[in-house]
């Protein structure tokens, strides 16, 4: 089985590299992204996470579907404060299929529905069921970006964009108040980030998420200590 997968990987790799280079060239030319938490480097990292998870899952994933969904899953990305944000991934999936049809005419049309579903289902706010291994892997790979050291960096970067406070100075640990991650960045760790491992769809994704969530919990503990000690 391992030998077969290695053979399949090496047969796929030239095609994957070809399409990846085309996608990156297009994005560098046509995709201006002011939100640096969702820039081209984010797409590179999500793709890397996809490869890592796919390599450990027993079900074979179509790597071209994964590659395409990874690099275009934020083609439409509405701000967290936008009331229509829950529809962002659907709009993104629609735009991606349209783009592939118009700009990448040699892209295999038979996998367009799989690309559409993976992109549509990846979003946390959309709450769409994943019906393919590619959708499950992409969702986990993207959520991994919210955990670990990178997750902390992106958390406070995004909080700065939104004009949020770092924490509630009167009650930073939220012992006597309701958590409010719209106003306090530190609250987002408990509101969402520490819950992410339980939402992972793949076994390997959950294992990775649990490790990175522990890192975030250690960070929160240390930050609270620095805030509260005299």
Task: State where each predicted segment sits.
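Short, positively charged and aromatic/hydrophobic N-terminal segments
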Residues: 7-10
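Divalent metal-dependent phosphate-bond-processing catalytic cores, especially two-metal-ion Mg2+/Mn2+ enzymes
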Residues: 12-15, 31-40, 44, 48-58, ...
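Short, well-structured alpha-helical segments
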Residues: 40, 44, 63, 67, ...
């Amino acid at each position: 089985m391992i030998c077969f997968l290695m053979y399949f990987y090496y047969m796929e790799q030239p095609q994957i590299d070809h399409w990846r280079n085309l996608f990156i060239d297009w994005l560098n030319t046509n995709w201006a992204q002011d939100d640096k938490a969702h820039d081209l480097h984010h797409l590179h990292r999500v793709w890397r996470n996809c490869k890592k998870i796919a390599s450990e899952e027993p079900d074979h994933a179509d790597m071209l579907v994964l590659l395409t969904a990874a690099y275009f899953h934020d083609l439409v990305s509405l701000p967290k404060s936008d009331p229509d944000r829950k529809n962002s991934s659907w709009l993104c999936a629609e735009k991606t299929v349209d783009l592939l049809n118009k700009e990448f005419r040699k892209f295999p049309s038979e996998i367009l529905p799989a690309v559409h579903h993976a992109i549509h289902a990846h979003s946390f706010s959309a709450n769409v069921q994943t019906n393919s291994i590619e959708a499950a892997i992409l969702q986990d790979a993207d959520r991994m970006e919210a955990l670990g050291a990178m997750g902390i960096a992106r958390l406070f970067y995004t909080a700065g964009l939104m004009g949020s406070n770092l924490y509630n100075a009167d009650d930073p640990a939220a012992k006597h108040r309701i958590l409010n991650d719209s106003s306090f960045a530190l609250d987002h760790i408990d509101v969402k980030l520490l819950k992410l491992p339980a939402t992972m769809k793949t076994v390997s994704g959950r294992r990775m998420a649990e490790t990175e969530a522990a890192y975030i919990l250690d960070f929160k503990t240390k930050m609270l200590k620095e805030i509260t000690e005299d």
